[in-house]
């Protein structure tokens, strides 16, 4: 956004303000000043008047001009095609340094051009360091100031100016106009905006006598129409320079007036030729009535129609070629909610006018009278124009944005304590309306209709801070404290991932399946289903009609798919949620191993197949300290199976299945897949499965214990014992008896024979170690005898020799 101090003076008096301080204030308010520089006209460039001109006798494109500069008359040869008598022009006198010519910097000297003496130069805007406004010389008019012959050009108000460029963020569409910048300065410095004076040249003929406007349906747009008759179109110098500086100057004078009105006020302006909107079917006393019809177009956007579509409101101006002849114009001011336009452009991919949609999607000025009155007043002042009395207004209700807040909340957001009166004063200067509520702690803030970016209490607090000055807020260290976010959920997640990483290290592949399952498949494999009243009401497919009660069915299906694809050795695991028959969610770990642990590869000339002990060892290493108890040895086997959602043991091998225990708590099941199930599912027979409840697993941190530095000793015993006694009971009894020096006991071998009857030969190894010294043979013998006596006492064991 580029503007000047001269343009700001149309709306607010800033003559007493220091430009540098004003730029700093704008930047602190969020309108970052990108550049600010004074206009500097070359010395010895003065105001002159062309008294007469005659063609050059020896050049077709040159004219000999007699120019008055007040104190004298000069003869100047000029080649500009727009030079005319009685024009006020910028005259560079002898000795003037002109920096911006095609040849670079030149010094004006008296010279002879094809035999004619020339004592100066008539300057164009570009040669004076100004933006280009035409292809000829720059013609001065009253908008530059009082034109006194011989006065230095730099002393005229239009050229004794500062040019400022600010960066406008996308949310500040209200500042895409000089009026918007003036409002910001008026608020910051507590100044009053200037009131507009009434227009002259308003004819008694009313707008309704020449224009009829029909609105077919409710459109989401606000429109205001006036009629202006332009008898002689002329674009003043100040408008030309202003638009050229912003890169929006075009050849059409009326288009330039419309762009200038929008640039100055932020109101979107358009125009139509009255005669182009003529309706031959309607004739009144004056013999002419133009008709505009406002309705929605094929994309649902408000559009203006006559005999054809003229424009899309807020999106496209339509074709604008007005010319310079005497004409009656219909002036249109419009406003559409920026969100509505942005959504419509995105939805319909409409190609609109870039500059128009740039403004309308960021939020134009909804106060249409400001824009249309400013434009009409400017046209009356600088052109031979008449404004018809009256206007036609199409108004839609605009929902005011109201925000409920407190002074305390605003102070907390800003970070300092401001008085209530100071906050209220700042908001009122910003044209916010404040209303008290029944609760004295709260008040309602009504946002001005041109501030589309204010939506929340944070926005209100930001406005207060902008005007108060962010530099006035002292910097303090940021106080932040991190709350203790480590909870059971975090530990569960970390432990499950640690478990997964361990299994991956052992070659297992993690897989994920649907939480839904087939109820028929669950029943076929011997798993419980959800209670009937808790089943899914609207399953996604017939095959996934219930919630899974086990991870194993889907895991076995994955094994089958992989075997069908040619994979022989398959190791999978999954960590996921399952549900009990009461729809209680649990987290479980399931493992499946199929095929061989290791293929044939030297030095293993034969493949190493999976077995229950190897499979259980990996489970133990990854999950933790586990023990396995034969299902047949458990008195409450049915209850435990039911707890783990099994209806029976049909999935499990009758002789290779066990409950998984951790610290004497049952947490899952490990087994070889029943051969009949493997056959029915067309699977290989060597498949091992395990399912563990993660919620029941112990993931406590490892405990460090003092260990002995003395050597260990081992002794082996072979005893005859009842074959129905599981080894875990033998080990449990021996360790609970706390026999001196006994550190561990584990089985070596077991032997069954008909000759032994109901007995079996169990070989165990006893690990012995002392914390105080190396054990002597006598101590070892005593320890072994103590072990044997416990076995005899508890299990009627007989030492086998």
From Swiss-Prot:
* Name of the protein this chain belongs to: Phenylalanine--tRNA ligase beta subunit
- Which GO CC annotations does the UniProt entry carry? phenylalanine-tRNA ligase complex
The record's catalysed reaction(s) read: tRNA(Phe) + L-phenylalanine + ATP = L-phenylalanyl-tRNA(Phe) + AMP + diphosphate + H(+)
Instruction: Give the GO biological process terms.
Output: phenylalanyl-tRNA aminoacylation
State the top-level EC class: ligase
What Pfam families does this protein's entry cite?
Answer: B5, FDX-ACB, tRNA_bind, tRNA_synthFbeta
Q: How does it assemble?
A: Tetramer of two alpha and two beta subunits.
Recorded family membership: Belongs to the phenylalanyl-tRNA synthetase beta subunit family. Type 1 subfamily.
Lineage of source species: Bacteria, Pseudomonadati, Campylobacterota, Epsilonproteobacteria, Campylobacterales
Annotated SUPFAM superfamilies: Anticodon-binding domain of PheRS, Class II aaRS and biotin synthetases, Nucleic acid-binding proteins, Putative DNA-binding domain
Q: Can you say where in the cell this protein is located?
A: Cytoplasm
The terms under GO molecular function for this entry are:
ATP binding; magnesium ion binding; phenylalanine-tRNA ligase activity; tRNA binding
């Amino acid at each position: 956004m580029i503007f000047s101090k001269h343009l700001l003076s149309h709306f607010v008096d800033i003559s007493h303000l220091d430009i540098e301080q004003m730029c700093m204030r704008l930047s602190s308010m969020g309108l970052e000043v990108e550049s600010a520089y004074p206009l500097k006209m070359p010395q010895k460039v003065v105001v002159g008047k062309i008294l007469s001109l005659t063609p050059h006798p020896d050049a077709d494109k040159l004219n000999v001009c007699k120019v008055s500069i007040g104190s004298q008359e000069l003869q100047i040869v000029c080649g500009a095609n727009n030079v005319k008598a009685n024009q006020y022009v910028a005259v560079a006198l002898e000795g003037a340094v002109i920096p911006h010519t095609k040849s670079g910097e030149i010094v004006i000297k008296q010279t002879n051009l094809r035999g004619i003496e020339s004592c100066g130069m008539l300057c164009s805007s570009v040669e004076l360091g100004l933006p280009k406004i035409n292809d000829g010389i720059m013609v001065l008019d009253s908008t530059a100031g009082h034109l006194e012959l011989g006065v230095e050009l730099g002393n005229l108000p239009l050229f004794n100016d500062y040019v400022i460029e600010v960066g406008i963020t996308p949310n500040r569409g209200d500042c895409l106009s000089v009026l918007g910048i003036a409002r910001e300065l008026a608020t910051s410095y507590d100044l009053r905006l200037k009131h507009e004076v009434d227009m002259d040249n308003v004819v008694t003929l009313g707008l309704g006598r020449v224009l009829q406007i029909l609105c077919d349906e409710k459109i989401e747009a606000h429109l205001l129409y006036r009629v202006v008759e332009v008898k002689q179109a002329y674009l003043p110098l100040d408008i030309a320079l202003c638009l050229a500086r912003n890169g929006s100057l075009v050849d059409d004078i009326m288009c330039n007036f419309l762009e200038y009105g929008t640039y100055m006020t932020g109101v979107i302006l358009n125009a139509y030729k009255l005669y182009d909107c003529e309706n031959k079917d309607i004739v009144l006393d004056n013999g002419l009535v133009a008709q505009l019809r406002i309705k929605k177009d094929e994309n649902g956007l408000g559009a203006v129609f006559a005999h054809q579509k003229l424009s899309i409101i807020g999106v496209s101006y339509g074709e604008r070629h007005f010319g310079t002849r005497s004409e009656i114009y219909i002036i249109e001011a419009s406003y559409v909610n920026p969100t509505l336009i942005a959504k419509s452009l995105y939805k319909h991919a409409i190609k609109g006018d870039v500059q128009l949609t740039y403004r309308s999607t960021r939020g134009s000025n909804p106060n249409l009278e400001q824009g249309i009155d400013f434009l009409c007043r400017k046209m009356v002042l600088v052109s031979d124009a008449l404004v018809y009395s009256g206007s036609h207004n199409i108004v839609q209700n605009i929902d005011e944005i109201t925000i409920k807040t407190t002074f305390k909340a605003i102070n907390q957001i800003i970070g300092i304590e401001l008085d209530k009166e100071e906050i209220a004063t700042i908001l009122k200067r910003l044209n916010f309306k404040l209303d008290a509520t029944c609760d004295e702690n709260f008040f309602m803030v009504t946002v001005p209709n041109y501030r589309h970016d204010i939506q929340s209490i944070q926005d209100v607090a930001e406005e207060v801070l902008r005007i108060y000055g962010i530099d006035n807020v002292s910097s303090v260290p940021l106080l932040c404290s991190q709350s203790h976010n480590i909870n059971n959920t975090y530990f569960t997640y970390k432990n499950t991932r640690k478990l997964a990483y361990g299994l991956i290290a052992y070659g297992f592949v993690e897989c994920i399946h649907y939480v839904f399952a087939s109820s028929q498949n669950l029943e076929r494999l011997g798993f419980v289903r959800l209670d009937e009243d808790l089943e899914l009401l609207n399953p996604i497919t017939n095959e996934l009609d219930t919630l899974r009660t086990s991870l194993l069915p889907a895991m076995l299906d994955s094994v089958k798919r992989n075997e069908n694809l040619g994979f022989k050795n398959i190791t999978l695991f999954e960590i996921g949620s399952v549900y009990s028959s009461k729809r209680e969610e649990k987290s479980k770990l399931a493992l499946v191993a199929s095929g061989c642990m290791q293929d044939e590869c030297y030095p293993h000339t034969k493949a190493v197949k999976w077995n229950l002990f190897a499979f259980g060892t990996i489970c133990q290493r990854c999950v933790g300290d586990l023990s396995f108890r034969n299902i047949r040895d458990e008195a409450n086997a049915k209850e435990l199976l039911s707890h783990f959602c099994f209806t029976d043991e049909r999935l499990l091998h009758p002789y290779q299945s066990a409950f998984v225990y951790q610290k004497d708590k049952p947490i899952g099941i490990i087994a070889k897949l029943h051969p009949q199930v493997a056959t029915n599912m067309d699977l290989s027979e060597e498949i091992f499965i395990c399912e563990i409840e993660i919620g029941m697993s112990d993931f406590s941190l490892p405990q460090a214990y003092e260990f002995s530095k003395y050597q260990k000793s081992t002794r082996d015993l072979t005893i005859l014992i009842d074959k129905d006694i599981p080894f875990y009971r033998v080990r449990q009894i021996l360790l609970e008896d706390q026999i001196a020096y006994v550190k561990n006991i584990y089985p070596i071998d077991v032997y069954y024979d008909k000759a032994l009857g109901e007995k079996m030969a169990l070989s165990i190894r006893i690990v012995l170690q002392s914390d105080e010294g190396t054990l002597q043979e006598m101590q070892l013998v005593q320890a072994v005898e103590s072990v044997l006596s416990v076995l005899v006492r508890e299990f009627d064991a007989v030492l086998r020799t």
